[in-house]
């Protein structure tokens, strides 16, 4: 096996890598990429700690999606910019713009009077009077008008979404299968469409300048290698490009970041770049190491749609925690597969810890659904929960569902239980149990809302009638409420003030940046005049009241003291297998030495990975890569949440292997659940610790062997070999004895040496030092 490769000192790595940066870092959030040579005005958005400046009563983000189609011109209730609780929120994502056939950002014909974004007017609607000084009308006019009154609120243009990732709707409402993000980023031979990406990025910059947005939010669903992921209308094109989607997605986000940085420097304001990210471990398995996070101001996790009528497994739409009882995971024998260590991944906490492995908590926002999902004719379960509801005729499954003996298509709730339904290509109702929360509140109270006729509910249709009783239930472990109609056997997964209170507290306690919700118009309030619930701001106000006195969010990636100097070592992760073949996950980690000195044989390299993966990560290259500090829950599962952020991982270069300047070393990794780019890298060599300049560009870069390592703890937890005062026993000379008085084990605090390194026992153990989570690496002898 060839372990060392030689590259020119300034060669670009193949695969994906961070870039070396030399520009001003004032106010830059920890871990955010900065375009080389551009002095980005971060301090217009962030304070000296890298935390976003919003307002004194908004220490956490409250981000609402505002949809273009609730304009009221179709006879259904309008939700306009004047209806937004501007004093309660911090960011508005306008949904959606799309990628047009010329690879440009677009909201359609901006000169048309019926264009909701730029052409519509609402005469006689209080608060919806347009600003006559702006050269456009529509939603964009009102958003700009209210932003002037509430300057703490930022607006972003969201591009894509489920329906418009691979195409767009024309002025007649017909979908144009233009290819959208897929063809804009990826050529048919799987190469990167650089021309398409640059065209789109240039148009995005021009767009936000023209309409006064503060950034771009990419809702690309989904650049994963998993077949048949995303909108079934896009499968034919997307499946043919799966092998190149992630590579081109990374390039898209890098180019957007660079062009937004350049525009920000020219305009004197920092522009935001964000995404709506999938949360399921299934989708993330096909997204490599999610190498786009470095380009994002923050990530909005779509921690909802975790269960729905696309299959028969009746469960929570947006559980906060795993319960060990998820019926979908159980059907695949997931909990009994030892490699996964009982880490359930269909919950918000798992997704949050996934991203925490590569980002500060404050650059993460969790998703909250202001809508329901549900099934009818549910069989079994506890008041429906974890029961099944398969469509009786499996030959009539909606596109993209069914076809599996394990995962059958579901029997989605319809009629009065599906107020906000989508339509299929024939114009028929898509069964999904999709409702705004104000409608589910009315169902729980036995109220037929006065709005029913404008949503097409016919009182003569039995499916549209209010029958049975909707009883409220709550899964305290999952933090998830639901409604159960025993007569109809209808299950609707919802959110209530009880679950919102728990999720708000979770955000506060874990230092998370805030929340994002889909969508503003789904929130509820009591309409006393009509005696019913309707569109309101109850839950949004609840988030505001919960957060207003919260502590600042977490602004640093590392939970340990990092070195105060850096070595110029650059890393990439590449060669992922595609789709279902990507198990176990075995990419190649490449480290390239761009330092002036060689990395000596025997040097230690350590890093953090998230507790969202098992603590069994290893390598296939003979480097002895192992977890030296396990963050695994003592319970052996993640029921009720993961208790730690990181596992600490380490490997040593063999004594004979020195990596000279310009050379690379490659290690093949081995793990079983997806993880993002590892973080908090430390090289320990020649008695000193070094961060990686690629990850910590603000640190002084020194030649390997020339520094003192600063006060960083490396992997020594504050100790060094010279500073260990306890007795160090050579393995297998155990310091503790069994009942016969024979050396047999170590207990917490005992130090043993093995293969040139010192380890400290975390608890009772008789395993090989450094072989599992019972040991903490201290230092190299």
Name every feature range the model reports, one short phrase each.
Residues 20-208, 346, 401-442, 448-458, ...:
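Glycan-recognition patch characteristic of GH18 chitinases/ENGases
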Residues 104-130, 223-430:
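Substrate-binding surface in catalytic domains of secreted glycosidases
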Residues 70-71, 432-552, 574, 587-590, ...:
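Extracellular low-complexity, Gly/Ser/Thr-rich intrinsically disordered linkers
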Residues 640, 644-647, 655-658, 663-710:
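Terminal connector regions
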Residues 581-589, 601:
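Short, solvent-exposed loop/turn segments enriched in Ser/Thr/Gly
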Residues 709-781:
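Tryptophan-rich substrate-binding surfaces of secreted polymer-degrading and adhesive proteins
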Residues 590-597, 609-611:
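Asparagine-centered strand-capping/turn motif at beta-strand->loop junctions
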Residues 186-217, 252-262, 284-298:
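An active-site-proximal structural segment forming one wall of the substrate-binding cleft
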